[in-house]
């Protein structure tokens, strides 16, 4: 089968925003204008096409990044058909992992901001993730029809809060209930959409007289930004020559692809204005798969040789599984992005991470949660496979004759855990299956059994995250669970270097004995300097410990790291240097050295100023002005560090850093302090040393 859409006409984009910026409504309008969805689905009554899990419809927030394919030929049908694959990303901080994994497979992104609320805390998190993956992006300032809407204020916030270089591509004509359309700053014309057909048709008109001066000023700004793309254009511009429309667009495109500028559009998705021109901007300025660098990976050759795959059908097949979802009718759906080559349904591919073969039974392309079966997918495509047995988010699927492991995604460690048990004993096995399946879908969610209490423990990124897991167990798997009190994921570390710590395990009382003897140094590592939080240096000279026993020493210490001596929490940010020891020809064994290492570790840890670390959350509260004092007082009582506050149209925004252990039940407390008028967001920031009284209480509670 030949390719129907050339790869240069693909746009793989994410639509990303803060929780109430109107992202789902924006996506709905995209699906409407691209002709896929003939009745516009509204989030207001819970009927949006992209929000396809029941909870999303009830809560009105987007949880899962569904992938949808649409086609667009331009507002004035000025382009050949372009295929736009849209990945919808959640805006709530407990679902940061969903944003992270979608950023990894996108080529470009549309950042949606609310014209009233502007750049919100979650927008900053998403922005950092987009920076990490170097995703070119444009912005859409939505809700221009709302009270307090101010386009240029949001443009300024993109500059001051995100440190970006925003360049308006349009200006809003009017605002609030007087918002009627936009000025196109490239064409220098006003665009007026037709209300009678929900904005499908439009007219170019003259710019309103009272806006001509402002439009000229911002047009000049746009031209200067374009001229900065090359010396040639700069010379032409400085020489007083006019730049053509094609030159302006080409130059702006280049600068967006280089992540030098962010072009800003505006509108009101709800009022059917602006999304159409934003789609044109996606085609004009965001990259196709061939405009972004080739994907990096390593060959599966035992030497980890670096390799890359280009976005071409002629290269060997390679794809990244970026999401696993459970579908009530077909079981597991594995969403994947094809980076190179072609794959057909029925083909066998290699999961190079697990060294296992998988057969692509059926391949479907999703339109929200409706699906269309397809025979093949090619470089640049995003699709879902049915029937893959053992694929986890982040695995590489590739041609068995050309194995490659693509760059892995990094997933954060959970910061909160709770014990769960089924309400009826009969559901025990069903609960295990449900949790196993949910953990496969979501790598930031973990499940394990506590060895001491034999309880099932689930852990995640926040209270809302775990609420939704428990809710999904009930809805999708029919398992009702009782949940325990949330537990904080503390860590342990050391603050001081200790040298020459000895560990000896010797049992030699006749017959074959056991003998292992090690001497180590222990030292603190800079937090975050080592992704594993642990390093092991082998400094043995002259064979005082034979090489075959060194891994056993490392293993013995790593096993101790899982449950530290202070209170049984994992130990992080610590290094070990093994530099001396002794062995016995007959009695030494791997086990003996493992035990000797654990004795040395416990001994050294006590002397190395051990401390308890607690997770600190970045908390942002928006509250009416009259409640500011109460909110700040309450945060201080929770050991919060105030980091600043600013006045907003809607009240005051307070920035603080608060230990997670003090934030349980905060939503209820905030509601009663402000009569339900305040809102807050919270996300994990860092681990920090817990004060001695807090640490003592935790250690004592664990010791009971």
Curated annotation (Swiss-Prot):
Keywords: Acetylation, Cytoplasm, Elongation factor, GTP-binding, Hydrolase, Nucleotide-binding, Protein biosynthesis
Broad enzyme group: hydrolase
GO biological process terms on file: ribosome disassembly; translational elongation
EC number: 3.6.5.-
Chief localization: cytoplasm
Listed SUPFAM superfamilies: EF-G C-terminal domain-like, P-loop containing nucleoside triphosphate hydrolases, Ribosomal protein S5 domain 2-like, Translation proteins
Residues with PTM N6-acetyllysine: 504, 643
MF GO annotations: GTP binding; GTPase activity; guanosine tetraphosphate binding; translation elongation factor activity
Keyword hit for Membrane: no
Localization: Cytoplasm
Residue positions binding GTP: 17-24, 88-92, 142-145
Catalysed conversion reaction: GTP + H2O = GDP + phosphate + H(+)
Keyword Lipid biosynthesis included in the entry's annotation: no
Residue stretches making up the tr-type G domain: 8-290
InterPro entries referenced in this protein's UniProt entry, alphabetically: EFG_II, EFG_III, EFG_III/V, EFG_IV, EFG_V, EFG_V-like, EFTu-like_2, G_TR_CS
Gene3D superfamilies, A to Z: 3.30.230.10, 3.30.70.240, Elongation Factor G (Translational Gtpase), domain 3, P-loop containing nucleotide triphosphate hydrolases, Translation factors
SMART domains in alphabetical order: EFG_C (SM00838), EFG_IV (SM00889)
GO cellular component, one term: cytoplasm
Family as reported in the entry's similarity comment: Belongs to the TRAFAC class translation factor GTPase superfamily. Classic translation factor GTPase family. EF-G/EF-2 subfamily.
Protein function: Catalyzes the GTP-dependent ribosomal translocation step during translation elongation. During this step, the ribosome changes from the pre-translocational (PRE) to the post-translocational (POST) state as the newly formed A-site-bound peptidyl-tRNA and P-site-bound deacylated tRNA move to the P and E sites, respectively. Catalyzes the coordinated movement of the two tRNA molecules, the mRNA and conformational changes in the ribosome.
UniProt xrefs under PANTHER family: RIBOSOME-RELEASING FACTOR 2, MITOCHONDRIAL, TRANSLATION ELONGATION FACTOR G-RELATED
Listed name of the protein: Elongation factor G
Organism: Escherichia coli (strain K12)
């Amino acid at each position: 089968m030949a390719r129907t859409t050339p790869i240069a006409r693909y746009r793989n984009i994410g639509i990303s925003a803060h929780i109430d910026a109107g992202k789902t409504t924006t996506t709905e309008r995209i699906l409407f204008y691209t002709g896929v969805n003939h009745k516009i689905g509204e989030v207001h009554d819970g009927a949006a096409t992209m929000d396809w899990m029941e909870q999303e419809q009830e809560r009105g927030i987007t949880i899962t990044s569904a992938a949808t394919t649409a086609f667009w030929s331009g507002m004035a049908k000025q382009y050949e058909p372009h295929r736009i694959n849209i990945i919808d990303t959640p805006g709530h901080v407990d679902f940061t992992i969903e944003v992270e994994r979608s950023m990894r497979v996108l080529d470009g992104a549309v950042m949606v901001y609310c014209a009233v609320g502007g750049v919100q805390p979650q927008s900053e998190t998403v922005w950092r993730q987009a920076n990490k993956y170097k995703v070119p992006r444009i912005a859409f300032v939505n809700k221009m029809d709302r009270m307090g809407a101010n386009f240029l204020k949001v443009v300024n916030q993109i500059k001051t809060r995100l440190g970006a270089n925003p360049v308006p591509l349009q200006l809003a004509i009017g605002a609030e209930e007087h918002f009627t359309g936009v000025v196109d700053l490239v064409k220098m014309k006003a665009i007026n959409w037709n209300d009678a057909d929900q904005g499908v048709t439009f007219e170019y008109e003259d710019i309103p007289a009272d806006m001509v001066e402002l439009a000229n000023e911002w047009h000049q700004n746009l031209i200067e930004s374009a001229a900065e793309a090359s010396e040639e254009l700069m010379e032409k511009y400085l020489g007083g020559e006019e730049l053509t429309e094609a030159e302006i667009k080409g130059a702006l495109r280049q600068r967006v692809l280089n992540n030098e500028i962010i072009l800003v559009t505006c509108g009101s998705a709800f009022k059917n204005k602006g999304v159409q021109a934003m789609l044109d901007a996606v085609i004009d300025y965001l990259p196709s798969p061939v405009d972004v660098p080739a994907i990096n990976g390593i060959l599966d050759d035992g030497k980890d040789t670096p390799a890359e795959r280009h976005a071409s059908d002629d290269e060997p097949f390679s794809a990244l599984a970026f999401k696993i979802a459970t579908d009530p009718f077909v079981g597991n759906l594995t969403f994947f992005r094809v980076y190179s080559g072609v794959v057909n349904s029925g083909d066998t591919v290699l999961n190079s991470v697990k060294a296992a073969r998988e057969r692509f039974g059926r391949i479907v392309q999703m339109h929200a949660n409706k699906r269309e079966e397809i025979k093949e997918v090619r470089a640049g495509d995003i699709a879902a496979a049915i029937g893959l047995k053992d694929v986890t988010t982040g695995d590489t699927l590739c041609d068995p004759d050309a194995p490659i492991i693509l760059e892995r995604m990094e997933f954060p460690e959970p910061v909160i855990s709770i014990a769960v048990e089924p309400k009826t004993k009969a559901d025990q096995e069903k609960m295990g299956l449900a949790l196993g399946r949910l953990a496969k879908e979501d790598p930031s969610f973990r499940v394990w059994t506590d060895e001491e209490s034999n309880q099932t423990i689930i852990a995640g990124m926040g209270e809302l995250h775990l609420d939704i897991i428990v809710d999904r167990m009930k809805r999708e798997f029919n398992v009702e669970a009782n949940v325990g009190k949330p537990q904080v994921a503390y860590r342990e570390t050391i603050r001081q270097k200790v040298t020459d710590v000895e560990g000896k395990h010797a049992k030699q009382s006749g017959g074959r004995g056991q003998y292992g003897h090690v001497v180590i140094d222990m030292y603190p590592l800079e937090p975050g300097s080592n992704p594993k939080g642990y390093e092991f240096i082998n400094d043995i000279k002259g064979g005082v410990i034979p090489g075959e026993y060194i891994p056993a020493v490392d293993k013995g210490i790593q096993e101790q790291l899982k449950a530290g001596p202070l209170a049984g929490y994992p130990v992080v940010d610590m290094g070990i240097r093994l530099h001396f020891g002794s062995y016995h020809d007959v009695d030494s064994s791997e086990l003996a050295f493992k035990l000797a290492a654990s004795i040395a570790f416990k001994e050294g840890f006590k002397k190395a100023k051990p401390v308890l670390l607690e997770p600190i959350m970045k908390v942002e509260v928006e509250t009416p002005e009259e409640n500011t004092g109460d909110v700040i007082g309450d945060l201080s009582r929770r050991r919060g560090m105030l980091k600043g506050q600013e006045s907003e149209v809607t009240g005051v925004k307070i920035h603080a850093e608060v230990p997670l252990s003090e934030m349980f039940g905060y939503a209820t407390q905030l509601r009663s302090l402000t009569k339900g008028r305040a809102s807050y967001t919270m996300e994990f920031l860092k681990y920090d040393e817990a004060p001695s009284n807090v640490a003592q209480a935790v250690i004592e509670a664990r010791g009971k």
